[in-house]
């Protein structure tokens, strides 16, 4: 059987980790720095005992939040992604000109995102707090995604040469299916800022989760005929169905 059966396979694994600021996109440092007025100081200025203007303890702001405040105080977002890929092939020679083949592949993808943003307070240039500070809250979230995609295919190949006549035929079956699930949770008012876990949030409990799956099944076939190395006829048939 060893001279009739051929087995091959390949696997790959990726483990990816990224840590970024808690705010991104239009609320991120780079976009805010493009929109922030260059005439504003980094910190609000106040006079010292000698009448000179020096930095206060409060960040300045304009029509948008101070990008440096976001850089230093916006918290973090951690993204962990793992991907496992595998593909396996088998080919069995039944008799001369007749082979059966099988291919199976799987892709396993997982992603976890942890985000924590402490409350960032804003003050007027005279040091008085904005009224919006009263509603400011710490925010923590965690989301998880699991995806598994699989493909299975069987083929039966026939090839025969009789004199100058060449006959070929193929019958096949394939199926692809995927299972996907998500789970997420958010909380506000984190009890201890250094402990970034969902259970540390005290109010505004919000949870979400989804699960879905799909499948695609196909049957296909082909018949071809050639004479003296020239293709004269070929017919193909395929039927697909999905869930």
Sequence positions of predicted segments:
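Outer-membrane beta-barrel strand-turn architecture
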Residues: 1-3, 92-98, 160-163, 227-229
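Surface-exposed loop/interface segments of Gram-negative outer-membrane beta-barrel transport/assembly proteins
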Residues: 2-85, 101-218
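Short strand->helix junction
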Residues: 109, 242-243
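Structural motif corresponding to the C-terminal cap of alpha-helices
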Residues: 160, 179, 211, 225-227, ...
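Structured alpha-helical segments in the cores of large, soluble enzyme domains
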Residues: 217-227
